[in-house]
From Swiss-Prot:
Residues 2-87 form the ACB domain. Coiled coil: none annotated. An acyl-CoA binds at K14, Y29, S30, H31, Y32, K33, K51, K55, Y74. This is Acyl-CoA-binding protein. It comes from Chaetophractus villosus (South American armadillo).
Length: 87
């Protein structure tokens, strides 16, 4: 697993033939943020921002996960989604 593989997966996920399910998108989002930013560094969105809260919660669950582990999980998930949805 390398930065190049991660970057490639980040581009490929944008080209899936079908948009993944919400839970799959949250997985992709949270692992991307953990790999690129690290532990969450923002306040939780307000109570009416349901989408923002879901994304924040998913990322927050990865607190303490290393960049390398987040990248590997992200790449593995993109490979799974490519098989499921096509590219």
């Amino acid at each position: 697993m390398s930065q190049a593989e991660f970057d490639k997966a980040a581009e490929e996920v944008k080209n899936l033939k079908t948009k993944p399910a919400d839970d799959e998108m949250l997985f992709i989002y949270s692992h991307y943020k953990q790999a690129t930013v690290g532990d969450i560094n923002t306040e939780r969105p307000g109570m009416l921002d349901f989408k923002g809260k879901a994304k924040w919660d998913a990322w927050n669950q990865l607190k303490g996960t290393s960049k390398e582990d987040a990248m590997k999980s992200y790449i593995d998930k993109v490979e799974e989604l490519k098989k499921k949805y096509g590219i």
